[in-house]
Swiss-Prot record:
Chain intervals for the UniProt region annotation (Actin-binding): 608-630
Gene that this sequence comes from: Myo1c
Every IQ domain range: 734-757, 758-786
This protein's name: Unconventional myosin-Ic
Residues binding ATP: 88, 96, 139-148, 192-196
Function as written in the Swiss-Prot or TrEMBL entry: Myosins are actin-based motor molecules with ATPase activity. Unconventional myosins serve in intracellular movements. Their highly divergent tails bind to membranous compartments, which then are moved relative to actin filaments. Involved in glucose transporter recycling in response to insulin by regulating movement of intracellular GLUT4-containing vesicles to the plasma membrane. Component of the hair cell's (the sensory cells of the inner ear) adaptation-motor complex. Acts as a mediator of adaptation of mechanoelectrical transduction in stereocilia of vestibular hair cells.
Source organism of the structure: Mus musculus (Mouse)
Length: 1063
């Protein structure tokens, strides 16, 4: 085993337990994890983990460069004190697994590298230990990763918190509320494919055990104008596309929808229905499953989808002008679907879309609408239906998340953790009413942030007994007052202009702003600006100098969006809806309420003030999300875009406030445990109080009085360079410590190994000696008994088997069988066999027979098909000629060849005449005439059905096997043979006399092909053959010194052949 000490960017010591499974332990000098300080040694490459430790903390360039270094190394999280800055990597970094959750669970904030889970765990532990409500505020630009951060936080709490006693239903509903809210509240924008188009604040309630038992969601400023209009390259809310793509055929048929989004006016304006990064079909399945988890009944789902479909049908309602220029509905089919889906009367809806009800002096009058007004009424209804449905949806989810134990006494012991996912500061080329509200929201949150940050800093200084140094910072209360002040604020002026009688327009609102607000250091219009500034301001614009910079707003649409008017008769129509959800969204009490509803800006202001109070009552934690580029590409760092976000998120102001006093503070125990190795007096162990040990340590390190302060429980270090110098000294010291640790470890390890080996050797020796002694004694005893039994058996070996000789006889038999196993015959020709004892003679013969059969069987199994055919032919030749023909022994060692003539040696005309008949064997022969016995060269061909005699390119004779009656050959060494044919066959001229140099091979193959093995006659003396019709010929055979074939004087063919073998 080896101990490997290595300094890596996270400051971890790696102990290698297994070569393929390193065990990582983040250790200080005596085992305390202080990862943040450890990472300082790699700061030149990966930057600092806390911006507070930047030397040039006032430099925006240094701030961004530190972000760049960390982003380049896939380190997307960095702290500004307790604030977490997150850069969206646009890819999965595999840092959110269960293993990562366990790594951050129950660990101090600075003991592990910056991570979302570190913030989540710190907040959760504070909630449990201090019993104080907590809040995590997540802000950033669209596409910066706010929604993803919220989901990861919920995932962390769902995985790591203890399960409630009544199961994990609340936990599942908290998680499953996200897909539903994303479907109805998120959309694809130019900056983000899953952009939240509303602000969300979620409370998660925990019981005294730390288990989630309930929740509540607040939504802010849904962008309902997106329902009726989208910019180029953007989409409507996800749910519309999910329904069309993933909805079942039966559902779409019931809703009167078709799958093509291009068929719906509200879905085509952005010209971006399909997005490669979005799988609407899969998201639909997730959303539908989530609805069932959060207690939606099938009827409620059906009613909800009917409303979604009704918005699409409403967008397809078209109008045409009659002769009085009044609008009339021309799309009857869409109107029919609308009345059914919304549960209203068709005539009532038609009238509400084309007329406006006016109440004057107690009388109700219907005023017809022109085309423009009708389109406005239609779009206003669509926005109202969708936005109110969204509000109902949030209420429904809240009912599902509400704790069932709210009435029990233990409910008082619950604590709340709030998650705020809110839009970041927005500055576009064209900024309107929505950006005004969003930026006002950010101003209020920035005001709260500065207030709570300064308060937290001041409380920590006071608790530690450190003198508080006033911090100079920009107080944006002046901007908040400019927007929200009663009577003189922008919202009040906007409301007044919306409510006053007469012809109010966006420009009259701007004129009133100029008259009321001027002069103001943070407000500017074309009229109030100087000559130079007027060039950048149109007459219909005003500019606010926010904490994050200047933003120019166009007043176009301010009054309309703030009023958010819905004609009375449209409200009446929707109040009569038979759709249960619509009936809840449009309460009939609205009709009897004569009070004018609050404007959108006022509603938002009141909601925001309520939110600020909620957040002020909690202990805050902050996550600032940054988008690295607009192209959503991984690894791309757009410095201009990031500088813009750093400015609008107020990160430099945040850092400046944090650095106004001391840059670094740490508990005495942690500081001493990390750096005590730098001082001989504190190393290796300090026996006194940690505070006294730190005092000794800093004196040894030479800290100047202005560089640090000693608090009650912490040391405060003013400058990062002081900490860097200390960390660099520790790095040098650590190298020597690592060497000493390795040396001590090796010595200890090898000594322990030696002692183990020594103890093992002594134990093994002792055991082995005993074992050998016992084995020796047992062997001697066994040997004596065996010898005694063998002698007794030998004496009685000829007696019948009895207990006295059974052992001996078994020994003899076993010995024979073992000897036989070693001396088995090696092949079929080996006839050796050991002599068996008398008792095994019969068994020996049986074994010998079995052995021979086995060898023969193995030999037969091993031969190839070609060799098998060769042996079969040789066996037939042996059966025919062995002991009968004198030259047979000379043919035995010669292999039979498949053919003696190649195809190229046979005339093509002969092959053509044979047709498809294959040639099985071909050999050159000599034919002797039947009369004069003149020899003539010929070719003998064997086919499957006949023997063919060929002369050059001509078939001279064909003898079918059926007409071949026999074959004659002499017993001498000559090579003549006669093929006998039927005399009755008129086609044949007579028997054929042939001579072949390979007579044994030729006759064997002919006999096999013609199936005439038993028809070969071996004659002695002479052979008689049919020479023609009514005439026979005779061949006489005699022995001589050499082969001679001639015609004798008696007219016979005389053959003299030498005798090769003695009989």
């Amino acid at each position: 085993m080896a101990l490997q000490v290595e300094l890596i960017p996270t400051g971890e010591i790696i102990r290698v337990v297994h070569p393929h499974r390193p065990c990582k332990l983040a250790l200080g000098s005596d085992g305390v994890r202080v990862t943040m300080e450890s990472a300082l040694t790699a700061r030149d490459r990966v930057g600092v983990q806390d911006f507070v430790l930047l030397e040039n903390f006032t430099s925006e360039a240094a701030f961004i460069e530190n972000l760049r270094r960390r982003f380049r190394e896939n380190l997307i999280y960095t702290y500004i004190g307790p604030v977490l800055v997150s850069v969206n990597p646009y890819r999965d970094l595999q840092i959110y697994s269960r293993q990562h959750m366990e790594r951050y669970r129950g660990v101090s904030f600075y003991e592990v590298p910056p991570h979302l889970f570190a913030v989540a765990d710190t907040v959760y532990r504070a909630l449990r230990t201090e019993r104080r409500d907590q809040a995590v505020m997540i802000s950033g630009e669209s596409g910066a990763g706010k929604t993803e951060a919220t989901k990861r936080l919920l995932q962390f709490y769902a995985e790591t918190c203890p399960a409630p006693e009544r199961g994990g239903a609340v936990r599942d509903r908290l998680l499953q509320s996200n897909p539903v809210l994303e479907a109805f509240g998120n959309a694809k924008t130019l900056r983000n494919d899953n952009s939240s188009r509303f602000g969300k604040y979620m409370d998660v309630q925990f019981d005294f055990k730390g288990a989630p038992v309930g929740g509540h969601i607040l939504s802010y400023l849904l962008e309902k104008s997106r329902v009726v209009h989208q910019n180029h390259g953007e989409r409507n809310f996800h749910v519309f596309y999910q329904l069309l793509e993933g909805g079942e055929e039966e559902t779409l048929r019931r809703l009167g929808l078709e799958r093509n989004p291009q068929s719906y006016l509200y879905l085509v304006k952005g010209q971006c229905a399909k997005v490669s990064s979005i799988n609407d079909k899969s998201d639909w399945k997730v959303m539908r499953k989530a609805l069932s988890v959060i207690d939606f009944t099938e009827d409620e789902v059906e009613d909800l989808l009917s409303i979604v479909a009704s918005v699409l049908h409403l967008g397809n309602i078209h109008f045409a002008a009659d002769e009085d220029s009044n609008a009339q509905v021309t799309t009857e089919n869409q109107l029919k679907y609308l009345t059914r889906l919304l549960g209203v009367e068709g005539t009532t809806l038609r009238e509400a879309l084309t007329h406006r009800k006016i109440i004057a002096k107690g009388e109700e009058l219907l005023s017809p609408l022109n085309l423009e007004q009708a389109a406005y009424a239609r779009d206003a209804l669509a926005k109202a239906v969708y936005s109110r449905t969204f509000t109902w949806l949030v209420r429904k989810i809240n009912r599902s998340l509400a704790s069932k134990d709210a009435e029990s006494p233990s409910w008082r012991s619950t604590t709340v953790l709030g998650l705020l996912d809110i839009y970041g500061f927005e500055v576009f080329q064209h900024n309107s009413f929505e950006q005004f509200c969003i930026n006002y929201c950010n101003e209020k949150l920035q005001q709260l942030f500065i207030e709570l940050t300064l308060k937290s800093e001041q409380e920590e200084y006071e608790a530690e007994g450190i003198a508080w140094e006033p911090v100079q910072y920009f107080n944006n209360k002046i901007i908040c007052d400019l927007v929200e002040e009663k009577f003189k604020g922008i919202i009040s002026i906007l409301d007044e202009e919306c409510l006053r009688p007469g012809e109010a327009t966006d420009l009259t609102f701007l004129e009133k702003l100029e008259d009321t607000v001027k002069p103001h250091p943070h407000f500017l219009t074309h009229k109030l600006a100087d000559q130079k500034t007027r060039k950048s301001l149109d007459r219909g614009e005003f500019r606010l100098l926010h904490y994050a910079g200047e933003v120019t707003y166009s007043v176009t649409g301010f009054l309309d969006k703030n009023n958010d008017l819905l004609f009375r008769n449209l409200k009446e129509t929707m109040c009569s809806s038979m759709n249960p959800i619509m009936a809840q969204c449009f309460d009939k009490s609205e009709l009897s309420d004569k009070k004018r509803p609050e404007t959108v800006a006022t509603q938002f202001k009141m909601s925001l003030l309520q939110l600020v109070e909620i957040l002020r009552s909690k202990e805050p934690a902050y996550i600032r999300c940054i988008k690295p580029n607009d192209a959503k590409q991984p690894g791309r760092f757009d410095e201009v875009l990031i500088r813009h976000q750093v400015k609008y998120l107020g990160l430099m102001e945040n850092l400046r406030v944090r650095r106004a006093g001391f840059a670094y503070r740490r508990k005495y125990e942690a500081f001493l445990q990390r750096y005590k190795s730098l001082c001989p007096e504190t190393w290796p162990m300090w026996a006194g109080r940690p505070q006294d040990g730190v005092a000794v340590l800093v004196r040894h390190l030479g800290y100047k009085p202005e560089e640090y302060k000693m608090g009650r429980t912490k040391i405060f270090i003013r400058f990062p360079k002081t900490l860097f110098a200390t960390e660099d000294s520790l790095e040098v010291r650590r190298q020597s410590l690592a060497t000493k640790i390795q040396a001590a470890w090796r010595g200890f390890h090898w000594r322990q190994k030696f002692l183990r080996v020594k103890r093992s050797a002594i134990c093994i020796q002792s055991w082995w000696r005993g074992t050998l002694g016992r084995r020796k004694a047992a062997k001697r005893k066994w040997a004596a008994q065996t010898i005694r039994r063998l002698i007794r058996g030998f004496i009685l070996r000829h007696s019948p088997r009895c207990p006295e000789n059974a052992f001996f006889l078994d020994h003899v038999r076993a010995s024979f069988l073992l000897n036989l196993r070693r001396q088995l015959p090696r092949n079929v020709l080996d006839t050796s066999w050991p002599t068996p004892p008398p008792a095994l003679r019969e068994a020996s013969e049986l074994l010998r027979e079995l052995c021979m059969k086995n060898m023969v069987w193995k030999y037969c199994r091993s031969i190839s098909p070609e060799w098998k055919q060769q042996l079969q032919q040789k066996a037939v030749a042996s059966e025919i000629f062995k002991g009968k023909k004198d030259n047979y022994p000379q043919s035995v060692p010669r292999l039979f060849i498949s053919t003696r003539l190649g195809t190229e040696e046979i005339s093509p005309r002969v092959l053509q005449s044979l047709g498809s008949e294959p040639i099985q064997y071909a050999v050159p022969v000599v034919k002797y005439d039947r009369k004069g016995y003149k020899p003539r060269p010929r070719q003998l061909l064997l086919t499957p059905s006949a023997v063919v005699i060929v002369e050059d390119a001509k078939v001279k004779q064909r003898i079918d096997y059926a007409n071949l009656t026999g074959i004659s050959v002499s017993s001498l060494s000559d090579s003549l043979f006669v093929l006998h044919v039927q005399r009755e066959d008129n086609k044949q001229k007579g028997d054929v006399v042939l001579q072949s140099d390979h007579v044994i091979e030729t006759l064997t193959k002919t006999a096999l092909s013609a199936d005439r093995v038993n028809n070969i006659n071996i004659n002695q003396g002479s052979i008689t053959f049919a020479g023609g019709p009514g005439r026979d010929g005779i061949i006489d055979f005699t022995s001589g010194s050499e082969l001679l074939i001639t015609k004798a004087k008696n007219g016979h063919l005389a053959v003299v052949a030498p005798r090769l073998n003695s009989r």
